[in-house]
Amino acid sequence: GYESMNVSKDMAYKYRARYYYTNRSNNQTYYGRWSNYRYFAMPSISGKTTNKKKGIKVVLKKGTGIKQYTVSVSKNSKSGFKKVKTVKVSKKKSYSFQITKNGKKKFKKGTYYVQVTPKVKFGNKTYSSDVSTVASAYVYK
């Protein structure tokens, strides 16, 4: 069996899972072992279309329980991301900045993908999120 949870953007979550099975003949439920805790957050992100001299404008919303964001860029939506910036969270409600290079290379005309991976804090420890959010932006001449 399974149960799902409602997830809100810009919120950090800590979860664990276990399998359970209910025998219909005797109505008895059997439970498996709990997994280790996992951590994730789904940040709100937008990548704005811009020209290649200005780069890509990225806007992030501050999330509850999120301590920093790692920002990466790629020409491919699924792989090849290169880290370009780390954003530490403060008291601001949102963060806006320009990315002018893809790693060490300047942007060329085309579609780029911006990936944001949050780091979440629970107790005294900080964990990298299991989930990243990706937004696309088109760079023109």
Region locations from a protein language model:
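Recognizes extended acidic, P/S/T-rich segments that occur
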Residues: 1-9, 70-107
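Intrinsic-disorder/low-complexity, polar/charged segments enriched in Ser/Thr/Lys/Arg/Asp/Glu/Gln
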Residues: 2, 12, 37, 55-57, ...
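Gram-positive cell-envelope targeting signals
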Residues: 3, 17-19, 35, 60, ...
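Beta-strand-rich modules
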Residues: 5-26, 102-126
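Extracellular fibronectin type III
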Residues: 24-43, 123-141
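Acidic Ser/Thr/Pro-rich low-complexity disordered segments
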Residues: 24-31, 72-88, 121-128
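Short, solvent-exposed loop/linker segments at the N-terminal edge
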Residues: 47-52
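Conserved aromatic anchor
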Residues: 54-65
